[in-house]
Curated annotation (Swiss-Prot):
Xref: HAMAP family: CitD
InterPro entries: CitD (IPR006495), Mal_deCO2ase/Cit_lyase_ACP (IPR023439)
Keywords: Cytoplasm, Phosphoprotein
Entry similarity comment: Belongs to the CitD family.
Main location: cytoplasm
Complex formation: Oligomer with a subunit composition of (alpha,beta,gamma)6.
Role according to the record: Covalent carrier of the coenzyme of citrate lyase.
Residue(s) carrying O-(phosphoribosyl dephospho-coenzyme A)serine: S14
Compartments it resides in: Cytoplasm
Name recorded for this polypeptide: Citrate lyase acyl carrier protein
Keyword Cytoplasm attributed: yes
Amino acid sequence: MKIIKEAVAGTLESSDLLVKVAPGLPDRLDIHIRSEVMRQFGAHIRAVIDDTLGKLGVTEGDVTVEDKGALDCAIRARLQTAVLRSVGDVKIEWEKLQ
């Protein structure tokens, strides 16, 4: 799946995150993470992001995550929302997202 337009999901409130997605370079997926808890949970946050984007089939784009201590479920929900807003009419295999 390729991100075709810019989209945003989330907030910068405590225990939430802001996800911005935009078209990127061809055949390249760039992920940028800024988090208040990067030292403690950075690897886990990255794993959740990679897993969610993988299940959605995202292979191209620029993803920026500004985390304020969000739980895994919020990270997944915000990523899914931003990506689905950015791809237009694409058939989603919902069972893969569980």
